[in-house]
Amino acid sequence: MGEKRLAKDRAWELDFLRGIALIMMLFMHTSWDFRYEFGVDIFSYLEAGWFWAFVHPVIVVLFVGVSGICSTFSRSNVKRGIKLLAATLVLNFGTLIIYKVTGIPCLIIFNVLSVLTCGIFLYALIQFIETKTGADPRIVNLVMGLAGLYIVICGCNIDYMNYCTDNILFIPFGFTIEGEPYMADYMPLFPWLGVFLIGCVVGRACYKDKKTLFANKVKAMKVISRPVEFIGRHSLIIYLAHQLVIYGILFVIFWLIRSAR
């Protein structure tokens, strides 16, 4: 009975939004592999300014922002952070080994998982300070919102700072690094940590009861949303595995095509 109630109260709309973002991300990465890894002249949208200016930011805002909202539901963000840190390290060292052994340019140093890990640990620290000091939640929300907005604004202006360094420790912050190795995937803390914090504020303000805002979902919507919700609920596993699976399938397909000629 309790499990059914939890399932009914679960904020399915967050799973749905994260699932939509992940599907769009999967399509983008598949397009990238076709066009750049296997040299197929399709998916030219990847070279269009409108995609990187408008569509790509929407995908990332959905994924990172919803993750921030979901952090306000967690009983232990420290445990979530440790779990995500482990997954991030596996991905980083895994791609490093593959890059060194095969020469495939798949190295990942700092990406969306790294941003989410930092965001979750930061929010866990904020929760700890809030609990210990008895701070007014409204003040905490205001400070987090302003900090998030400041980080977003800074992140949007980093490209115009024309700051360059040879210190790789600046990679997480989005600065240009001299001699920076090619990274198959990259996402800096600025502006995306700010988006995460703003997501936390939205979660605290709109999901105080930690329940869905759309409890009376119609049957037609259930049929459409369930597969997407499933993807959203298992986003970490899918994200970790998707590029290896997609690249592997395409490698086999193109190998068979070349062998048949």
Language model regions located:
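Alpha-helical transmembrane segments and their immediate juxtamembrane cytosolic regions
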Residues: 1-261
